[in-house]
Amino acid sequence: MVNFSLGFFSITMRVVQKIAKLVDGTAWSSASNAYHRWRHPIDPQEIIKGIDSAGFAKIREKFSVPGERTHWPKYLDAGRWLPLNIRRAQELRLTARARPLRILDLGSGAGYFLLVARHLGHSGVGLDISEPPMYGELFELFGLKRMVWEINAYEPLPDLGERFDMVTAFSICFNAHKRSDLWSPKEWAFFLDDLEKRFLGPGGEIFLGMNPEEDGSFYTPALKQFFIERGAQVDRAKVWFKRVGG
């Protein structure tokens, strides 16, 4: 009886989740993204061919931790992380833009997203903290540009001397992720105002990929409402402001 009850509960929850997706539009978004990926495939091997294999091997030998899948050494597994960033680029429609975009990637990590973007004809700048040094060495190996900077609440970003068509931030941690001082709408308002006024060109876009907090949520109800009222399309972890620059 217990096994039957648990099985029934699991099925019921999946049905409820599917209905919720239909109601809030995420099912349509998922289907649209899947269709776009099918129409615009990207072969990760084509990107890997452009990487200096000997140089990458040296970095791997220097920083790798066998079996590590949680902390930063995991990003040395290009075969695992390139497909994820290809998917991100496809969902942002970087495969079907009318012209090359200039991209600012915040919390740029190992640089795989900008590497994929360059493969598609775009260019950009990464911004991240100095640690771990592996990130800087990978950026140099990939021939990508990076600014070292720590993002903090109520502090403007450094002047980069240019404006961008798109600002991205994936798996965000700079919002005091999993800390007691997690950003509220006030901190986000300062941050977004700074991006829009100083970094976005006309018709620019901002894409935020939120990290789940301790309770599994990506944002409080108040923060979600703030994003929506500011004009974002919100799809679970994804918060996309379109045509907000200028």
Predicted regions and their residues:
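Conserved class I S-adenosyl-L-methionine
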Residues: P100-G109
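Class I SAM-dependent methyltransferase SAM/SAH-binding core
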Residues: Y112, R118-K145, I151-A153
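Short catalytic/ligand-binding loop motif for oxyanion handling, primarily in non-cytosolic enzymes
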Residues: F113-L115, Y135, N175-K178, E214-Y219
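A short acidic, Gly/Pro-enriched loop at the edge of an enzyme's catalytic core
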Residues: L157-M166
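A short SAM/SAH-binding and catalytic strip from SAM-dependent methyltransferases
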Residues: M166-P185
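A short glycine-rich, Lys/Arg-flanked "PGG" loop and its adjoining helix->strand segment in the class I
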Residues: L182-P202
